[in-house]
């Protein structure tokens, strides 16, 4: 929308304690992208997301904490993570925590930035009074395995950078393995779904053709 930058800048002007804010992010079909607002990664959040519990209990604050689906998408709310596709950061916050970490490539840098902003004492807000359309996945189109690798790499960087001390009694390598396996499962599932449906359609067409020919020759 034309007023998006003005709306976000105005929100920062009205709330000096806020270090970053982001708007509602939509798919081209108007569906809300869950990455519009999220919670920080943690072993519990990862388990609930990868096990499917967050989908079964989308309104439970503890179980659906990663995508914060318990929040009303039409209400302004304090969150932990914003999508890098549309995030406005206060200059004072940037001066304090620095810019995006260049160790990340395409994924995870927004989570890392929000974590540092939050840790420095700034608030982070989701502002749905304005919105953008995000054509996600375009940068990685045609390279699914590379994207899977980059996402897993980004989460490994974040875990090693920020979670080693916080969860020092938890075997974080299990979390990294889980993230990698979840990514592989999603890739296999998407590949199967993309190929199975056309093959099923082709099989039905061939069966119909064979049945039609059999009936025709039987009548003759």
What are these regions (language model features)?
Residues 2-38:
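Conserved donor NDP-sugar-binding/catalytic core segment of glycosyltransferases
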Residues 115-191:
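Active-site-adjacent helix/loop segment of glycosyltransferases
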Residues 211-219:
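Juxtamembrane "helix-exit" motif on the non-cytosolic side of transmembrane helices
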Residues 197-208:
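Alpha-helical transmembrane segments
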Residues 3, 71-131:
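A short, conserved alpha-helix in the catalytic core of glycosyltransferases
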Residues 39-40, 103:
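A generic structural motif
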């Amino acid at each position: 929308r034309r007023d998006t930058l003005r709306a976000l800048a105005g929100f920062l002007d009205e709330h000096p304690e806020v270090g970053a804010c982001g708007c509602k992010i939509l798919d081209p079909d108007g569906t809300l992208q869950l990455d519009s607002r999220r919670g920080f990664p943690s072993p519990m959040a990862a388990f609930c997301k990868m096990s499917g519990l967050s989908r079964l209990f989308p309104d439970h604050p503890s179980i659906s904490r990663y995508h914060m689906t318990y929040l009303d998408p039409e209400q302004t709310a304090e969150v932990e993570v914003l999508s890098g596709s549309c995030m406005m950061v206060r200059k004072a916050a940037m001066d304090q925590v620095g810019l995006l970490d260049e160790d990340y490539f395409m994924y995870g840098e927004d989570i890392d930035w929000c974590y540092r902003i939050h840790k420095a004492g700034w608030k982070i807000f989701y502002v749905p009074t304005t919105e953008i359309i995000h054509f996600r996945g375009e940068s990685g189109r045609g390279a699914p395995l590379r994207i899977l690798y980059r996402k897993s790499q980004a989460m490994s960087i974040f875990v090693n950078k920020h979670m080693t001390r916080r969860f020092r009694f938890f075997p974080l390598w299990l979390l990294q393995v889980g993230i990698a396996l979840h990514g592989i499962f999603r890739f296999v599932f998407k590949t199967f779904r993309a190929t199975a449906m056309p093959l099923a359609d082709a099989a039905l067409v061939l069966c119909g053709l064979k049945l039609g020919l059999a009936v025709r020759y039987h009548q003759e």
